[in-house]
Amino acid sequence: GRSIYSVGDLYSGYDQFQLAVDSCDITTMRTPIGLVRMCTLPQGATNSVAHIVNAMNKVLKDCIPSITMPFLDDIPIKGCSDEEKDESEDKDGCRKFVMDHMKDCEKVLERLENANLTFSGEKSAFGQPEILVVGHLCGAYGRKPSPSKVNVINDMKEECVTQMEVRR
């Protein structure tokens, strides 16, 4: 486990990736208000996930795996391990391991800014003792499944009847 974490989620993740101009026409669909043509990466399209994974790996290549392991548009930023943790204070009274973590956060943010990508302020958190990443809680204790996800399974009826019950 780690003593400090941060997590960022891209603001409208898929919408931040522009489609090639010649690809826009093949996304055209009819709606009650007329034809709509996508100009950004459509969420749920066959190759959208692969495109996001490749783009994030390219943008953050020098930060993977030492600082982050992005999952689609979720970007967890891990602090130092307990073995590397330096509790000494700098001249401003901030612990060194916290400052090191903030420098790592800055490095990730710079890479995203250079790629014209933006974090969502509402869905991002910095300098936290625990974060939720892809259904798992990460903290000083290590990683464990989120209790809310486990409770859904524990509270499940013996037999699922509807599609909605199966999906939960």
Where are these regions (language model features)?
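Retroelement reverse transcriptase polymerase core
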Residues: 1-168
